[in-house]
Amino acid sequence: DNAIIYDDSVSGDELARLEAFSQDLIAALISIGVPPCPGGIMAKNPEWRRSLSGWRQELTRWLSATTPDNVMTGSMFMDLRPLYGRTDLVDALRTHAFHYMANEQGFLVRMAQNMTNFAPPLGWFGRIKVEKSGPNRGQIDVKKAGIFAITDGVKALAIEAGRLQGSTHDRMEALVDAGVLK
């Protein structure tokens, strides 16, 4: 997944260059074996290439209308990390999200509810359950069976504590330092 955030003052010519760059970037990633995102979450798509104010509006929409898709997309967006350019734009979006969620807990509540949709793959007497049919027959979906609940649980706690930077491990350490986790 990738996106572009640009300053609100970017000119039309600069926007055209950003669009061309984003097309070239995705083509280059594909050429070295990085598969395109099946959900289309790529900077070459205009909805994933916005100004700071455009991203603020979209983020507010995700946080306020807590449909399953908005919660999934908003949660994923909280993992945003700058790879190049002005990190203050990412910081501004995080600050916007924190301020919004400090006053409106609906998104965090829905995020926590979503975690209950992914139960551990245990059956009777603690036996491991595997997929019964389809292309993954006999296998466990590790992402859905455990990793998702851990990463999103830590993410929800990190959002509430205002310590969202870094990986899941970094967030866990920050939560321990803040006394949220022991």
Could you tell me what each predicted segment is?
Residues 6, 40, 154-157:
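Active-site proximal loops enriched in glycine and acidic residues that flank catalytic Cys/His/Asp
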Residues 11-75, 84, 88-96:
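Conserved catalytic core of two-metal-ion nucleotidyltransferases
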